[in-house]
UniProtKB/Swiss-Prot annotation:
Residues 1-30, 95-117, 187-198 are cytoplasmic. It comes from the Eukaryota. Homodimer and heterodimers. The keyword Lipoprotein does not apply. Signal peptide: none annotated. Residues 52-73, 139-165 are extracellular. Belongs to the Casparian strip membrane proteins (CASP) family. Keywords: Cell membrane, Membrane, Transmembrane, Transmembrane helix. This is CASP-like protein 1U1. It is found in: Cell membrane. PANTHER family: CASP-LIKE PROTEIN 1U1 (PTHR33573:SF47), CASP-LIKE PROTEIN 4A4 (PTHR33573). Its main location: membrane.
Length: 198
């Protein structure tokens, strides 16, 4: 019999002695999601910062500025923080794809990624929902049984409202992408547990 060693190269992933696991599908999809998250949150921040308009009407000056609304301030802060997180996660995902080792390759780091993505997604949902409530009242007004009335605002500063609406849509897209990243981390944890048991 020949003593020539036989080398078996795994095609989809590998497991090492430290309960680490690498899957090219996870790494590639993680990098793509991080890039899209960074793009969506950056677009949300930039567009909201541009949401400023002043118009002169027969009733006087009508001004729409994001800084006049606490909900829009929180919106910008939340999206900016998530953008920084997504940018750092993109760098980590890029290094993981090259080195075939990353945060989704080990249980502790995969759990940390899962929790951070969950917190970031919750922050985006909170900020986008609050901003959406303000935007809807500004566009449609509100009448509560004739006692309290908020008149429509967007018929005077259309560009301001359109910009705010576009920023909110971008933020909700970022939330959806973060939700997918959370599911991806959960999938990686499932694969790690399966390979640890087998």
């Amino acid at each position: 019999m020949s003593d020539t060693p036989v080398v078996v190269i795994p095609r989809k992933g590998y497991v090492d002695g430290h309960h680490g696991y690498h899957h090219s599908y996870h790494s590639g999809l993680n990098l793509l999601l991080r890039l899209l998250q960074a793009f969506a949150t950056a677009a949300a921040v930039i567009v909201m910062l541009l949401a400023t308009q002043t118009e002169f009407t027969r009733y006087g000056e009508v001004r729409g500025r994001w800084r006049d609304y606490p909900a829009y301030k929180w919106f910008i802060i939340a999206n900016a923080v998530v953008f920084v997180y997504a940018l750092l996660a993109t760098l980590v995902a890029c290094c993981a794809l090259i080195a075939r080792r990353g945060p989704l390759s080990y249980s502790p780091s995969a759990w940390l990624t899962f929790l951070l993505d969950f917190v970031a997604a919750s922050a985006l949902m909170s900020a986008a929902s609050a901003a959406l409530a303000v935007a809807l009242i500004a566009r449609n007004g509100q009448n509560l049984q004739g006692q309290h009335y908020w008149p429509t605002f967007c018929n005077y500063v259309t560009r301001f409202c359109d910009y705010a609406q576009g920023a909110i849509i971008a933020s909700f897209c970022g939330f959806g992408l973060l939700a997918l990243s959370t599911l991806l981390a959960a999938s990686a944890l499932h694969h790690l547990a399966w390979h640890r048991l087998h």
